[in-house]
């Protein structure tokens, strides 16, 4: 099975190892992975800020970049969720509506692809540590991915998995929301940080890197010793003793 990696901006620039882990996981389950170098931003920041025409330029480039891909898989529910919005955005456009539908139909977040497409719920991973999971808003509400990440985490040998209280509450990031509404955002992430502390987890795991930056930043400012990691880092671990 051939899969094209949608790296996403934050993974490309900030969380470079997430791309590596994603590729290694896909290869472990028998996928042949390529990287279309012409890909760019999915257009979400511009779109959410009201710059529709500017956003469409990025979206058209993405459609062209992945035109020949069999499957498109990315390590972000938010960014993949944006690809799923393309058919709505290009609805009625004689040149771009069908290509937008084609891209949306073959695009998946990594855990969604593993569980729902490949039927993989156990990667044979080993990880020792107390872990809690934050389900991001876009992952759950836009993309509809709720069970797949936890199924995979709970299959990891040696893991001590604990549910996050009121787990589906927003962390306050929301892309440009945290910039436009900083006071509200700060209170939301403060509450999320408290919920993480209540679990006594050593690791906070998530599938969207914007959320991880936001929550991790808050916990560091509070002096909390909780490691914040992307789910692919846990799933691609084959040793006991956690992450250094």
UniProtKB/Swiss-Prot annotation:
GO terms for biological process: lactate metabolic process. InterPro entries: Cys_rich_dom (IPR004017), LutA (IPR022822). One of its GO terms (cellular component) is cytosol. GO terms for molecular function: oxidoreductase activity. Belongs to the LutA/YkgE family. Is involved in L-lactate degradation and allows cells to grow with lactate as the sole carbon source. This is Lactate utilization protein A. The lineage of its organism: Bacteria, Bacillati, Bacillota, Bacilli, Bacillales. The gene is lutA.
């Amino acid at each position: 099975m051939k899969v094209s990696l949608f790296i996403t901006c934050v993974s490309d620039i900030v969380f470079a190892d997430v791309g590596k882990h994603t590729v290694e996981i896909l290869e472990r389950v028998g996928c042949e992975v390529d990287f279309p170098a012409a890909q760019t931003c999915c257009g979400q920041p511009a779109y959410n800020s009201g710059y529709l025409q500017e956003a469409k330029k990025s979206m058209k480039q993405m459609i062209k970049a992945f035109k020949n891909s069999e499957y498109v898989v990315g390590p972000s529910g938010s960014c993949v969720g944006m690809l799923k919005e393309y058919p709505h955005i290009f609805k009625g456009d004689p040149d771009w509506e069908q290509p937008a539908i084609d891209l949306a139909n073959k695009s998946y977040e990594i855990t969604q692809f593993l569980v729902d497409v490949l039927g993989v719920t156990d990667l044979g991973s080993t990880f020792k540590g107390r872990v809690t999971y934050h389900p991001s808003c876009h992952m759950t509400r836009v993309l509809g991915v709720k069970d797949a990440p936890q199924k995979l985490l709970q299959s990891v040998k040696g893991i001590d998995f604990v549910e996050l209280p009121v787990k589906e509450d927003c962390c306050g990031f929301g892309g440009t929301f945290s910039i436009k509404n900083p006071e509200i955002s700060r209170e939301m992430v403060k509450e999320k940080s408290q919920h993480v502390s209540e679990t006594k987890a050593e690791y906070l795991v998530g599938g969207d890197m914007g959320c991880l930056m936001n929550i991790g930043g808050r916990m560091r400012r509070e002096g909390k010793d909780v490691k914040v990691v992307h789910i692919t880092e846990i799933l691609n671990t084959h040793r006991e003793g956690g992450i250094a």
